Amino acid sequence: MCDPIREDGSNKRGAVSKEKRPYIHREWSWADIIRALTVINVHFLCLLAPFNYKWEALRFGFVLYALTSLSITFSYHRNLAHRSFKLPKWLEYPLAYFAVFALQGDPLDWVSIHRFHHQFTDSDRDPHSPIEGFWFSHVWWICDTRYIKYKCGGRNNVMDLKQQWFYWFLRMTIGFHVLMFWTVLYLYGGLPYLTCGGGVGGVIGYHVTWLVNSACHIWGSRSWKTKDTSRNVWWLSLFTMGESWHNNHHAFESSARQGLEWWQIDITWYLIRLFEVLGLATDVKLPSEIQKQKLALTR
């Protein structure tokens, strides 16, 4: 006898019933439309960049990509999602705020989805599961919020953040902050800063992040025995600020360091280590040698 399906789409064994999901011809929520328009607009601005080229604007775009990407990896990912180190609130909050300008959502939404990803990695309930195809795990999942709720349920895995007023404030006002930022870009540098700066920088930041969800579960090498398809992709490590050592990350989720070997570039870890030396980052978590020996593929 088949297990009954619950309202969240799961049966009593916790598995989601598998069905072919249409990407375009489906019911779209307002959240889906807003996300899709944001992604489309950023790519459109990037396509306009050659017609509004200014070197200083393009240089700003590269800097914007680097800083917002680092804010995502440092704040949203390793600090908030995995609690791999602690920061004083006067530092934690501004870093989380700056990550908003990466256009990847507010902290509550980003952290919840990422925690679900680790809870249900490579299964039907993974929010951006690679088993549904490269393009789904790369980008399509972003614009299907009802499917995420259907698979994972509500945002009940971020109670630690929900208890803090600042993250509720960002969630309720994120649209204002993003529009304010892009308005300032235009007022400061006109179309060149919107296209070469925001457009080019935004597109690079988008796809570098998305490749961790897609490519790093398909191609690359494995150093650790994990129950998923995570891979280490060395050539992405510089661009992702160290996030592409993805097999390392899935083996030791709470580790503040993902480039576990000396030669594995991990810019996010270098910043965490600097903050630790300065006394700003505390309780920095790293895997023990015993943990490494248990999961190592080669000894």
Swiss-Prot record:
Domain notes: The histidine box domains may contain the active site and/or be involved in metal ion binding.
EC class name: oxidoreductase
Superkingdom, taxonomy of origin: Eukaryota
Transmembrane annotation, as ranges: 31-51, 55-75, 174-194, 199-219
Subcellular location: Endoplasmic reticulum membrane
A Pfam family per the record: FA_desaturase
UniProtKB keywords: Endoplasmic reticulum, Fatty acid biosynthesis, Fatty acid metabolism, Iron, Lipid biosynthesis, Lipid metabolism, Membrane, Oxidoreductase, Transmembrane, Transmembrane helix
Motif residue range(s): Histidine box-3: 246-250
Motif (Histidine box-2): 114-118
Molecular function terms from GO: acyl-CoA desaturase activity
GO cellular component: endoplasmic reticulum; endoplasmic reticulum membrane
Pathway(s) annotated for this protein in UniProt: Lipid metabolism; polyunsaturated fatty acid biosynthesis
Protein name: Delta-9 desaturase-like 5 protein
InterPro entries: Acyl-CoA_DS, FA_desaturase_dom
Topology term for the membrane: Multi-pass membrane protein
Naturally occurring in which organism (per UniProt): Arabidopsis thaliana (Mouse-ear cress)
The keyword Protease is assigned to this record: no
